[in-house]
């Protein structure tokens, strides 16, 4: 593979680059994390579950991407749902705590779509689990 962009899945069935992604250094993987996180937007996609360990591998690099994904103006509430229910639980509690304000914002001041798509319920469940562990 000549370019990092070649490692980004081309479709929801494209798991051909998973091993190569796992071998990337943090600095290289960080460059494509915003593209990779989009592939967990539907957890029925074969690629989604395989990307979770890769996305969670370097928590300090994925935290800013998660924060951006959870912003109120981001319209992809299905992606928010899967980030909250599948990706964040795979981070250590130290990194989960870095996302507390973002999670509380969803709970206390959700957008209409965050309420409609059950993102709020997932945020409450996640917050309860984080607080239980700490």
PLM feature segments, named:
Residues 1-5, 26-38, 60-71, 93-108, ...:
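Amphipathic alpha-helical scaffolding segments comprising HEAT/armadillo-like alpha-solenoid repeats
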Residues 5-11, 25, 40-44, 55, ...:
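Alpha-solenoid helical repeat architecture
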Residues 6, 14, 35, 42, ...:
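Acidic-enriched, low-complexity/disordered segments with a strong bias for Aspartate over Glutamate
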Residues 13-14, 32, 47, 99:
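N-terminal alpha-helical segment
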Residues 34, 38-82:
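Amphipathic alpha-helical interaction modules
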């Amino acid at each position: 593979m000549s370019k990092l962009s070649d490692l980004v899945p081309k479709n929801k069935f494209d798991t051909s680059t998973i091993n190569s992604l796992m071998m990337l250094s943090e600095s290289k993987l960080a460059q494509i994390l915003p593209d990779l996180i989009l592939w967990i937007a539907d957890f029925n996609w074969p690629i989604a579950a395989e990307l979770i360990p890769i996305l969670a591998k370097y928590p300090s690099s994925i935290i800013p991407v998660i924060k951006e994904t959870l912003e109120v103006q981001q319209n992809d509430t299905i992606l928010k749902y899967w980030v909250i229910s599948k990706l964040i639980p795979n981070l250590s509690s130290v990194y989960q705590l870095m996302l507390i304000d973002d999670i509380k914002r969803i709970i206390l001041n959700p957008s209409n779509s965050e309420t409609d798509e059950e993102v709020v319920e997932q945020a409450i469940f996640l917050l309860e689990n984080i607080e239980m562990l700490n």
